[in-house]
């Protein structure tokens, strides 16, 4: 007769909880302005790690890959080919 001896091991020892329960704070990454929204120069548009979204027209890239507006205008999220995205800021024409 075949007898299986299954043992399940605890992922945490059942002793104390002082070494458990740590987690890092969220970094609040992602879009900070929506498509079509009016922004002023210097406004943060997108916080990211790496280049998930590339800078387009009138958009700069900071040291931590944050995208920011260089001029006042309207935000546009656009596609760059099949697998890339970019964000651009187009100035609004001033009416006289």
Swiss-Prot record:
The N-terminus is cleaved by ribosomal processing cysteine protease Prp. The keyword Ribosomal protein applies. GO terms for biological process: translation. Transmembrane segments: none annotated. One of its GO terms (molecular function) is structural constituent of ribosome. It comes from the Bacteria. InterPro entries: Ribosomal_bL27, Ribosomal_bL27_CS. GO terms for cellular component: cytosolic large ribosomal subunit. Coiled coil: none annotated. Residues 1-9 form a propeptide. PANTHER family: LARGE RIBOSOMAL SUBUNIT PROTEIN BL27M, RIBOSOMAL PROTEIN L27. Belongs to the bacterial ribosomal protein bL27 family. This is Large ribosomal subunit protein bL27. It comes from Bacillus anthracis. The lineage of its organism: Bacteria, Bacillati, Bacillota, Bacilli, Bacillales.
């Amino acid at each position: 007769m075949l007898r299986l001896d299954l043992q399940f091991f605890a992922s945490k020892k059942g002793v104390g909880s002082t070494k458990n329960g740590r987690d890092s704070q969220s970094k609040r990454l992602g879009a900070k302005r929506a498509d079509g929204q009016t922004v002023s120069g210097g406004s943060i548009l997108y916080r990211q790690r790496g280049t998930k979204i590339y800078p387009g027209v009138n958009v700069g890239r900071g040291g931590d890959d944050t995208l920011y507006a260089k001029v006042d205008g309207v935000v546009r999220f656009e596609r760059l080919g099949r697998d890339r995205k970019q964000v651009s800021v187009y100035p609004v024409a001033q009416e006289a």
